[in-house]
Amino acid sequence: GCADEPLESLSGKTPLQAANIPAMDEIAATGHVGKANHVPAHLPAGSDVANMSLLGYDPNEFFSGRAPLEAAAQGIQLGPYDWAIRCNLVTIQDQIMDDFTANHISTEEATELLQFANSRISDSRLEFIPGVSYRNLLVYRGSESDQPFTMETRHTAPHDLTDKSVSNDYPRGPGSDLLVDLMNQSVEW
């Protein structure tokens, strides 16, 4: 971070302590310190919720998960009945989450795997969308009469399962059967 560690070459000071930073010194001397909470208590504490709030969007009204924000950042158009779902590539050994980043898979390799997965899906409403490295999306193109997911559809973030069994932490709630089926199929592909 900005403060870094004390260095012998700087007489035991951190780079920040040794730097000539009059503007920052002025702010520190005359500024005020406060705090703000940008994450409502009932929403997951994460940068997606906090950034939405910092940008002026009430997460109570607009937050529907990280994936729609990532889809928008990629220029993916979502209709009123479409769902963007985060699709992380992971490494599981003997039902234990070995690595939630798929060993830091390259974007190129992840794209190749997702293209293969798309070729195996017979449901035209589903499409895997490559992102960066292990962080990807699944887009479900729904309709007014076809909405399997709701805000009650839940999952456990892969990073929360590191070195733990994944056998009891599948998606749950409306539409989870579709997601679990895709997860199980992906093991066979």
How should each PLM-predicted stretch be described?
Residues 3-119:
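Active-site nucleophile/metal-coordination loop of metallo-enzymes that catalyze phosphate/sulfate
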Residues 66-186:
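A contiguous, mid-domain pocket- or channel-lining segment that forms the substrate-recognition surface
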